[in-house]
C-alpha cells in the first residue's frame, strides 16, 4: 500500500507507544528471516517495515512517559501527544504540568515536535 501511495499516512491513536519498538523489531525480523511469511510480496522500494513506519506512520499518545524516554527508537517525527480533551480521562486542566513532568530533560526541539509540530505537519497547518 505504501509503495503505491508513498504520501499516505496511517496512525494509531490512543494506544500509547511502548508496543512499537517490539512490533518494529518483529516486523523487520519476519521480513528478513522468515521468507515463507513474505512469499510473493517484497517492497518495491527495498524498504524494511520499520522504514515504512518512519515514512508513513505515526502514533498518538497521552500518558506514556516511557515512550518519551525511548523516542529515538519510536521516531521523534512519528510521535504526537494529545490530551484527550474533553474526555474524563484527559490530562486537562493539568496538561502543562503533565507535559513538564513527562518531558523533563527532553530537548525543547523534540518536545515541540511531539506536542505541536508533528501534528501541524500531518494535518497541514502552521503551529502557533
Task: Please provide the spans of the model-predicted regions.
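Iron-sulfur cluster-binding electron-transfer modules in prokaryotic oxidoreductases
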Residues: 1, 84
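Histidine/acidic residue-rich metal-binding segments in metalloenzymes
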Residues: 2-51, 65-77
Amino acid at each position: 500500500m505504501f509503495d503505491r501511495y508513498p504520501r499516505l499516512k496511517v496512525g494509531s491513536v490512543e494506544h500509547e507507544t511502548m508496543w512499537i519498538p517490539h512490533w518494529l523489531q518483529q516486523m523487520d525480523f519476519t521480513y528478513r528471516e522468515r521468507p515463507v511469511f513474505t512469499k510473493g510480496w517484497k517492497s518495491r522500494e527495498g524498504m524494511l517495515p520499520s522504514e515504512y513506519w518512519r515514512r508513513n506512520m505515526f502514533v498518538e499518545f497521552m500518558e506514556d512517559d516511557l515512550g518519551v524516554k525511548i523516542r529515538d527508537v519510536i521516531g521523534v517525527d512519528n510521535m504526537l501527544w494529545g490530551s484527550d480533551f474533553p474526555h474524563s480521562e484527559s490530562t486537562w486542566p493539568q496538561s502543562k504540568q503533565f507535559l513538564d513532568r513527562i518531558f523533563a530533560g527532553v530537548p525543547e526541539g523534540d518536545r515541540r515536535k511531539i506536542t505541536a509540530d508533528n501534528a501541524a505537519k500531518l494535518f497541514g497547518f502552521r503551529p502557533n
